């Protein structure tokens, strides 16, 4: 079975649970997880990449760079998109060195700012020209940023607009541009054609909000709403098969994480201190495994899997039976988690004084 939960020890995954999650309930969830391994997931690779062309935004560092390298190892042709040409050139060297078939695979980069209006049309035009007149087979929107601040802090609204431009509109513009290519009548392949894949990158904060991420969290909720909408909308074009996916990473040890810590309120650090931080390579590997398993909701940790099931609403399910069972249980867990977090917040405020008096990070 091509999914990390089944290839890695379940106990290792359980170790990543926050101490706020009770062990008895985690044991019940583990039992459900074991049930899930009993033939409920297909072993088919639903997103083969060998010989296909993948375009990734945010590919010069962090998770995007790691994903590009691992896709190269699987035989993909890769187009890297990011702003910084120097980092793109460095990443391109690593991606090319990882090639499964060096004599046939092709690689390039395109410098672009995803926050700029209508950037995607020019990027795709360049990508299509480089790819012999063919659009990329897979587009993965990874580019993102986070500026944690209290909502009452100076600069929070400017940060919110900037986060929305990068995280939401950067992905929204790319998704619209590529879907106009893939779904055009002249590109119809019939319902049995090899599907294209559009991959969004959200965050576990789109499943469970935490104090201090006001400028950031709404951008990922918006992205989830767009992904849910497009997952339904592509069915309106049955002769142009497209699969939509959305990945939910947690904390990734990356340059972006270092930048977000420069403004992160101390109380936010306290609330998320038990959340494990993963390497970009680990997160990319698990995300790719989820995509290959055909998942719409792509989790990259056991905790993320639990959180998804507790807040799926009308989103497409990976597995109706398992997700429904876990969806009954997770709200009970949330009752205790939220009570613990809110208790910490109140205690912190009483000990530290009024938040307006706290020293601000520069």
Curated annotation (Swiss-Prot):
Gene Ontology CC: one annotated term: endoplasmic reticulum membrane
Pathway stated in the Swiss-Prot or TrEMBL entry: Lipid metabolism; sphingolipid metabolism
Protein family according to the UniProt entry: Belongs to the short-chain dehydrogenases/reductases (SDR) family.
Keyword Cytoplasm: no
UniProt-recorded name of the protein: 3-ketodihydrosphingosine reductase gsl-3
Function in brief: Catalyzes the reduction of 3'-oxosphinganine (3-ketodihydrosphingosine/KDS) to sphinganine (dihydrosphingosine/DHS), the second step of de novo sphingolipid biosynthesis.
Species in which this protein is naturally found: Neurospora crassa (strain ATCC 24698 / 74-OR23-1A / CBS 708.71 / DSM 1257 / FGSC 987)
Residues binding NADPH, per UniProt: 58, 60, 62, 83, 87, 113
Lineage: Eukaryota, Fungi, Dikarya, Ascomycota, Pezizomycotina
Bilayer topology: Single-pass membrane protein
Record localization: Endoplasmic reticulum membrane
The UniProt record lists the keyword Endoplasmic reticulum: yes
């Amino acid at each position: 079975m091509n999914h990390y939960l089944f290839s890695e020890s379940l106990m290792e995954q359980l170790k990543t649970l926050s101490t706020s999650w009770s062990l008895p309930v985690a044991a019940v969830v583990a039992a459900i997880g074991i049930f899930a391994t009993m033939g409920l997931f297909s072993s088919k690779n639903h997103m083969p990449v060998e010989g296909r062309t993948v375009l990734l935004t945010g590919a010069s560092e962090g998770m995007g760079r790691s994903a590009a390298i691992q896709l190269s190892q699987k035989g993909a042709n890769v187009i890297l998109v990011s702003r910084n040409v120097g980092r793109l050139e460095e990443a391109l060297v690593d991606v090319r060195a990882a090639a499964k078939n060096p004599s046939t695979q092709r690689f390039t980069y395109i410098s672009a700012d995803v926050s700029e209006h209508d950037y995607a049309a020019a990027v795709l035009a360049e990508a299509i020209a480089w790819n012999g007149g063919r659009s990329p087979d897979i587009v993965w929107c990874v580019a993102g940023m986070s500026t944690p601040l209290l909502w009452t802090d100076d600069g929070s609204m400017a940060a919110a607009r900037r986060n929305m431009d990068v995280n939401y509109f950067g992905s929204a513009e790319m998704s619209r541009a590529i879907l106009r290519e893939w779904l055009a009548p002249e590109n119809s392949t019939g319902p049995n054609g090899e599907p294209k894949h559009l991959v969004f990158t959200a965050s576990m904060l789109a499943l469970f909000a935490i104090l201090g991420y006001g400028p950031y969290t709404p951008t990922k909720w918006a992205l989830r709403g767009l992904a849910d909408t497009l997952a339904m909308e592509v069915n309106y074009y049955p002769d142009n098969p497209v699969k939509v996916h959305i990945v939910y990473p947690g904390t990734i040890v990356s340059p972006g994480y270092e930048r977000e810590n420069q403004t992160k309120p101390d109380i936010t650090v306290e609330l998320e201190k038990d959340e494990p931080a993963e390497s970009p390579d680990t997160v990319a590997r698990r995300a790719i495994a989820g995509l290959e398993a055909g998942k719409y909701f792509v989790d990259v940790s056991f905790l993320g899997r639990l959180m998804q099931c507790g807040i799926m609403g009308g989103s497409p399910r990976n597995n109706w039976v398992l997700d429904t069972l876990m969806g009954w249980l997770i709200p009970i867990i949330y009752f205790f988690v939220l009570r613990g977090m809110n208790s910490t917040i109140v205690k912190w405020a009483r000990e530290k004084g009024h938040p307006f008096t706290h020293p601000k990070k520069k």
